[in-house]
Amino acid sequence: MLVYVVFGGMLATTWVQIIKALLLIAGALLLSYLVLQFHHFSFTQFFNAVAHADYGGSAAPKNLMEPGLKFGVAVAGPWGPLDLISLCLGLVLGTAGLPHILVRFYTVPDAKTARSSVVWAMAIIGLFYIMTTFFGFGAATILKKALILTADGKPDTNMVAPILAQQLGGEFFFAFISAVAFATILAVVAGLTMSASASFAHDFYSNVLHHGKENRPGQEVKVARITAFCVGAVSIGIAIYLGPSVNAAFLVGLAFSVAASANLPVIVLSVFWKRFNTSGAVAGLAVGLIASILLILLSPNGIYGKAGAPFPLENPGIVSIPLGFLAAWLGTILTARDPEAEAKFAELKVRAHTGLGSEKATAH
C-alpha cells in the first residue's frame, strides 16, 4: 500500500479502488446467492432459520429476529439503547464527513459528473449493505462456533465472511473472498493515506507554514510522499499494537463518529449558513475531534476498561457530534463578521447547485 501511494499517487489509488469495487460487488453477489441457495431460495425458510439459529454454537437456539440481543438493557445494561442510537448517529452522519470519500470529488471533471458519481455510489453501496444481511444471518445459521474460533478460543469475527465462503464455495471461493477483503482494506487505507498526505502537504505545509507562497518545484509532492510514508508507518504500528482480536467493524464505527463530530459540522454550516466563518470552522473541527477522541479513550473500551470508565457509552457520537456543531456555532457568533465572505455566499450556492465557476479537474 505504501509503495503505490508514495509512487503512484491518486491515479494508482483510484485504479485500486475501481478494481476493488468490481471484485467486492461480484464476490458479495455470489456469496449472497450461495446463502440463498443453501436455504433453497426461500426467504421464509431463511428467516425461519434465523429465528431458530444456533447463535454462536450455544446449546439453546436464539431468535436473531428479536430486538435487544446486543444493545438491549438486559444484555448491555441501562446505557445499551442510548449506545445504539449513538452508533447509528455516527454511521449515518459520519459517511458525509469521511475525508477519503470527500477527496474523490476532486477527481471528476465537473459538478454534473460529481452528482452522477454520487448516485452510482449510493446505488452500489445500498446494494452491498442489503447483501450484508445475508452474510450475517447466513453465517449465524450455517457456521458453527468451532469454525470461527482463534487459537486461544475466542471468536474471530473478522474472519466470518471468508469462512462462510469456504463452507459454501470451497477453497477457491475462500481464497477469492479473502483476496477481495485484502484489496478492500488496501483501497480504504490508501484513500485515507492519500487524503492525509495531501491535506498536510497542501493545507498545512504550503498554506500555514509557508503562508501560501510558491515553494520549490516538486517540494509539495515530496512532502506529501514523506507524509504518506509516516502515516502508513504509524497505522501499521497501531494495528500491531491492537492485535487481530479487535473487531474491525467496531473500529469503523469509531472512525465514523470522529468524522461526524469534526468534519460534518464544518461541511453543513459552510453550505447552509451565510455567516459561518473561519473561526467557527476551526472551533468546530478542533472541539469535534478532541471531544470524540477523548470520549473514546474514556469509554468502556478505552484506557480505564469497562469497570472504571468515566464515560458509559462505547460510541461517542451522541455527545461529540452536538459538541462539534455547538463549537462551530459559538466560534462564529463570538467573532467578528466577515462581510467579504458573506457577500460570496450567493455565489457559493449557485456553484454548489450548478457547478458554474468551479475549478476543472487536473491530471493526477
Regions found by a protein language model. Give the residues of each.
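Membrane-water interface regions at transmembrane-helix termini and the short interhelical loops
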Residues: 1-21, 103-110, 265-276
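A generic transmembrane alpha-helix motif of multi-pass inner-membrane proteins
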Residues: 278-343, 347-364
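Loop-to-helix junctions at membrane interfaces in multi-pass transport proteins
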Residues: 22-175, 302-317, 346-363
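Hydrophobic alpha-helical segments of multi-pass membrane transport proteins
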Residues: 24-35, 234, 253-295, 323-335
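Transmembrane alpha-helical segments of multi-pass small-molecule transport proteins
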Residues: 1-12, 224-233, 257-266, 318-322
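Loop-to-transmembrane helix boundary motifs in multi-pass membrane proteins
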Residues: 201-246
